[in-house]
Amino acid sequence: MSDDNAQHSDKENKKGFFSILLSQIFHDEPKNKEELLTLIKYSEENELIDRETGHMLEGVIHITKQKIRDIMIPRPQMITLKLTYSLEQCLDVITKSLHSRFPVMSENENYVEGFLITKDLLPFIKNNTEMFCIKKILRPAIVVPESKHVNHMLKEFRLTKNHMAIVIDEFGVVSGLVTIEDILELIVGNIEDEYDETKKNICQLNQSTFIIKSLTSIKEFNETFNTNFNDEEVDTIGGLVMKKIGHLPIRGEYININQYKFKIHIANNRRIILLQVTIPKK
């Protein structure tokens, strides 16, 4: 009997809290984002929403603070096509990267002429190879400033039905690109497609600099660079870097670990995404 009373009491408490929650939302709205985040946390703790839902709600709130420069893919990491490319050259890049959309650069690579969507190549693959002209099948490129807020970019993507935009700096120079997937990942977490497992965790930029996915295991890092990094509490190189820094770092922040320089290349409000690593000279 006492167990039944306890369960009834728990339900009443949750019902009471839910009433307060509804009152907060529809009558006495939270005064600021901090109060709203606190309300979400309380909702999780009282099992009114699950943790995953809480994460998504927090993500929606946090994107209002972020700008495109915080989440964009930097220009050195952009995979592009050139206006002068033949069909064969385009297909070579496409099959290696497995992306579905590509910025097409001008001959001097200073400007983006437009976007190529891979499905637009299908009519040329079988019978019309000689008729192929990349310029004739380009889609217009959306260009946005680095300072644009992420939530405004998401709204623009939704209204224009576009999935990718070119990012320019204050001087009008291409500095990167942003996709709708980059923004959605801020809300729902990492989105992996069927090809993600084939993409390399470690990519070499030059003799001493590498771009590394933060989810790369410490074991793989050690095997690649012949290092002996080890930590019982974390398994990934991103986790190791964040532990050493002591907080969730922002883009551009760096730390030296055993003569290896780790620079935060891309990060969002929850995690490190990419690291730029400079290895010591031998």
UniProtKB/Swiss-Prot annotation:
It comes from the Bacteria. Residues 72-131, 137-194 form the CBS domain. Pfam families: CBS (PF00571), CorC_HlyC (PF03471), NMB0537_N (PF21917). InterPro entries: CBS_dom, CBS_dom_sf, CorC_N, FAD-bd_PCMH-like_sf, FAD-bd_PCMH_sub2, Ion_transp-like_CBS, Transptr-assoc_dom. GO terms for molecular function: flavin adenine dinucleotide binding. One of its GO terms (cellular component) is plasma membrane. Keywords: CBS domain, Cobalt, Magnesium, Repeat, Transport. Transmembrane segments: none annotated. Gene3D superfamilies: 3.30.465.10, CBS-domain. PROSITE patterns: CBS. Plays a role in the transport of magnesium and cobalt ions. Belongs to the UPF0053 family. This is Magnesium and cobalt efflux protein CorC.
